[in-house]
Design a protein with these regions (language model features):
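Glycine/threonine-rich beta-strand-loop-alpha-helix active-site module
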Residues: 19-53, 122, 126-171
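C-terminal non-catalytic interaction/assembly regions of soluble proteins
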Residues: 263-392
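Glycine-rich nucleotide/cofactor/substrate-binding loop typically near the N-terminus or early
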Residues: 22, 27-104
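Accessory alpha-helical/coil subdomains and C-terminal extensions
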Residues: 99-100, 104, 111-113, 119-123, ...
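Short, ordered loop/turn segments at secondary-structure junctions
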Residues: 4-6, 34-39, 72-73, 114-115, ...
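Short glycine/serine/threonine-rich phosphate/pyrophosphate-binding segments
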Residues: 8-18, 41-42, 76, 92-95, ...
Length: 392
């Protein structure tokens, strides 16, 4: 097994769940873990799941992070693998990985990651098959963006929304630290606004239930979210600024929740026009943490709102590093149990609720897995949220 990509509140629990299931139904199966994802596979860095590890596997459900380490490695990006010292010049990373799996006697590979991780696993399985080595690959869908096609709910996303709302609750208390305060809460989500919307909904729900004194800065109106911006919902800055200026004038603060993917096309276009290099990761994705969408939004709104102070905060690392909540733990258990059972049947795929098959939990074919699933901004819970905060 291996975990790969960024963290999510499911990795530790998923590793624990896989170990527990194998111990329960196939205790004689040898289980190893590659450290630091595909980097460990390329370097032959693996550890045995011992009897002691099996006995303590249940403890992994209480923690965030991953017990076996992660990395962002694309096996088909030869140049990057060579640059990072994972393979030598002239070597094919797919061949190196295949040889390592063969040497280790691996006939089932469990990958826990996003669409890139699982598509890479599919590439590896296809390469092995073409070279006469059969490998069953069973993936688990990890991404807090909840943007994997055709999977209804990715592991860890519910927890990330809950934790992002907790983060926002404390950050938004800063509205009382300065007159005319603009707070921008930047939420992870490259191409999909689901996490931003779900985080805003969770925070708004808390505001509705909280018992405020309704005195000056301690009021629902000053603690609530005032606007939610996601990539899938275009908006006019001038129109929004006019609406938000009225909120600033009345309540002395404005709290925005924005997806890190909102406004990226405009930012990238401006950088390219200025002749600046756009930073990208090994998968070709724009490195959002280096172009700072939150700062861009703050700059667009600050003057128009007459803000005296601007605070931009990112909840991503806080929310993605949490231990899984009860809802995610239940989903993780269903998926890890199914993943092991599928592996023992020799059935490859990514385990999840298949939206195109009536939300059936199954091993979804790799050629149907893709990233970039769009958030449905017509979802009733989201349109109701926008209506309640005056943004509809």
């Amino acid at each position: 097994m291996l975990t790969a990509g960024g963290l999510a509140p499911c990795l530790s629990s998923a590793v624990g769940g896989l170990i527990e299931r194998y111990t329960a139904v196939a205790p004689d199966v040898r289980v190893i873990a590659y450290r630091n994802g595909y980097a460990g596979l390329l370097k032959g860095d693996s550890v045995e799941v011992t009897a002691q590890v099996r006995a303590n596997a249940h403890r992994l459900h209480a923690f965030g992070g991953t017990p076996i380490g992660n990395s962002r490695v694309k096996l088909t990006n030869v140049k990057d693998c060579v640059k990072r010292g994972l393979v030598h010049e002239g070597q094919d990373p797919l061949h190196v990985a295949a040889e390592q799996l063969s040497r280790d006697g691996v006939d089932v590979l469990h990958t826990i990651g996003g669409d890139d991780t699982n598509v890479t696993a599919a590439d590896l399985a296809a390469y092995l098959r073409s070279n006469g080595y059969e490998l069953t690959v069973v993936g688990l869908p990890k991404t807090i963006d909840n943007d994997v096609v055709p999977i209804k709910q990715s592991l860890g996303a519910w927890t990330a929304a809950e934790q992002g709302a907790l983060y926002a609750r404390n950050i938004i208390a800063e509205h009382s630290s300065n007159p005319r305060m603009l707070i921008v809460h930047e939420v992870m989500g490259r191409n999909c606004g689901w996490l931003t919307a779900a985080t805003a909904l969770a925070h708004h729900g808390w505001v509705q239930q909280a018992r405020f004194a309704e005195w000056l800065e301690n009021s629902a109106a000053t603690w609530d979210v005032h606007a939610v911006f996601v990539p899938e919902r275009p908006f006019g800055i001038a129109d929004e600024a006019k609406r938000l200026r009225a909120i600033m004038d009345e309540h002395d603060c404005v709290n925005l929740f924005i997806s890190e993917g909102a406004g990226v096309s405009e930012i990238v276009a401006a950088m390219e026009q200025a002749g600046e290099e756009v930073p990208r990761d090994p998968f070709g994705h724009v490195q959002l943490d280096k172009i700072n969408p939150g700062q861009w939004f703050a700059k667009q709104f600050a003057a128009a709102l007459g803000a005296d102070k601007v605070l931009v905060q990112k909840s991503g690392y806080f929310s993605r590093s949490a231990a899984a909540n009860r809802a995610d733990l239940d989903l993780i258990r269903q998926c890890t149990d199914y993943a092991v059972d599928a592996a023992l049947r020799g059935e490859s795929g990514v385990v999840g609720q298949d939206e195109e098959r009536g939300d059936e939990l199954r091993a979804i074919e790799f050629d149907r897995i893709a990233g970039g699933k769009k958030f449905d901004v017509t979802a009733p819970w989201f349109t109701e949220l926008l209506r309640e905060i005056g943004q509809a």
